[in-house]
């Protein structure tokens, strides 16, 4: 039990959280209205998620590979980022952003004391000299403000999800790409030092994406930070999804199979203790999320063999809930009885929900910018219908982009019946789309 693996959580009273919620609403409203938060920051923001972050990252990588480029990425690891925020620097940044009355924030941050309680024994109280209160409502948005100008020190693409940071660059020469990313990582390290944050170089990872044919050329790809070599990997875990060098999804599917098989084995061993509803609930809560997690970004790139292996696992889950024999055939009626969509249709469902948000302007701009509505191009009806549809750009037809979210989501949306596209409420759209997908069962 290494104490370094634990994080302090502030135990705050209810009244303080009521006040925090009011200030949070005002602060977020101001930052969004003035468009201050970094465009590619996906953490703790309404309409943003791990899904949108991964969709943007994977589609960008696919786009660059389709152009014949190598794509290098460095995963940055920060030491206790939330716990080392400097109060004075944060207050200065808030003032630069135009936030008034920073004295209130100074009072909120300073004067706090904490102790550690283990087994009923408490340590001495110590003053908190840095860090945003973890477990608070304001802490996350204050941290976003603190690292908001990180991108100003860089010339490469920066993708953020709270403190999960990635540096991304592309180019046709692998050696030039290595040198460029090394320089960018050093610039990032300098920015972190200036802002009293610490880079954990030993835990940083680098990866290069390319077609299988070009991977042999990538042997010399390596990223350094002031002489320290950053560990290169063939697959990297980012926001719960394994990304491999050619975005085949093989590493991620292998991880899913291992986790789902383990969970199902445990559930089978305890099946006699559970009734139908309990089994269904447990599978929905403990197993199904492995299939669903950010599936819009990775599933289309998976080959047929791997998709079949996922399908076999899902059918095994159906047999478990319905008390069927191991060799029993599972058909559409069994899925309908459980109210579960097959994996292929679940992916379609999630893509259509994202497409709806894009269509209605509810998704992040970094996703919406790849979608063009027909009404913004044509002033007349081109398909014999008044229903709007998405137009595909020429580059989305390139080989690597065919499996992208951008390309496949447009196809799914354009195939959707016109009456579904006219729905204005998101919750209603979700319900009716599920019913529409179940019609074929």
Predicted regions and their residues:
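Amphipathic alpha-helical
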Residues: 365-408
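Short, charged alpha-helical motifs in flexible N/C-terminal segments and linkers
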Residues: 62-70, 189-207, 214, 306-376
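Basic, alpha-helical interaction scaffolds
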Residues: 228-297
């Amino acid at each position: 039990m290494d104490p370094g693996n634990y994080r302090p959580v502030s135990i705050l009273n209810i009244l303080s959280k009521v006040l925090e919620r009011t200030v949070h609403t005002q602060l977020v409203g101001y930052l969004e209205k003035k468009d201050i938060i970094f465009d590619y920051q996906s953490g703790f923001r309404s309409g943003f998620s791990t899904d949108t972050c991964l969709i943007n990252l994977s589609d960008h990588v696919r786009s660059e590979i389709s152009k014949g480029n190598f794509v290098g990425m460095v995963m940055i690891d920060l030491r206790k980022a939330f716990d080392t925020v400097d109060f004075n620097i944060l207050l200065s940044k808030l003032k630069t952003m135009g936030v008034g009355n920073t004295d209130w924030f100074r009072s909120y941050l300073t004067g706090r004391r904490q102790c550690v309680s283990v087994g009923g024994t408490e340590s001495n109280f110590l003053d908190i000299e840095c860090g945003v209160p973890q477990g608070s409502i304001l802490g996350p948005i204050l941290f976003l403000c603190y690292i908001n100008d990180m991108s100003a020190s860089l010339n490469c693409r920066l993708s953020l999800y709270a403190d999960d940071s990635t540096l991304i660059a592309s180019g046709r020469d692998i050696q030039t790409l290595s040198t460029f990313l090394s320089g960018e990582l050093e610039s990032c390290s300098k920015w972190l030092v200036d802002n009293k944050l610490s880079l954990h170089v030993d835990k940083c990872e680098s990866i290069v994406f390319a077609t299988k044919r070009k991977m042999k050329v990538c042997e010399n790809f390596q990223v350094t930070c002031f002489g320290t070599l950053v560990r290169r990997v063939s697959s990297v875990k980012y926001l719960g999804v394994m990304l491999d060098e050619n975005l085949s999804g093989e590493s991620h599917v292998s991880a899913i199979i291992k986790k789902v098989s383990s969970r199902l084995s445990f559930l089978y061993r305890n099946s006699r203790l559970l009734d139908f509803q309990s089994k269904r609930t447990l599978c929905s809560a403990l197993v199904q999320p492995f299939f669903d997690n950010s599936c819009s970004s990775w599933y289309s790139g998976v080959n047929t063999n791997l998709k079949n292996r996922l399908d076999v696992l899902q059918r095994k889950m159906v047999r478990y809930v319905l008390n069927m024999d191991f060799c029993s055939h599972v058909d559409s009626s069994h899925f309908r009885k459980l109210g579960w969509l097959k994996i292929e249709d679940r992916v379609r469902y999630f893509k259509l929900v994202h497409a709806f948000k894009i269509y209605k302007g509810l998704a992040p701009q970094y996703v919406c910018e790849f979608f063009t509505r027909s009404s913004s191009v044509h002033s007349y009806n081109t398909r014999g219908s008044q229903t709007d549809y998405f137009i595909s750009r020429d580059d989305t037809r390139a080989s690597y982009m065919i499996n992208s979210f951008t390309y496949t989501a447009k196809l799914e949306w354009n195939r959707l019946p016109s009456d579904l596209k006219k729905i204005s409420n998101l919750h209603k759209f979700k319900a009716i789309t599920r019913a529409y997908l179940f019609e074929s069962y």
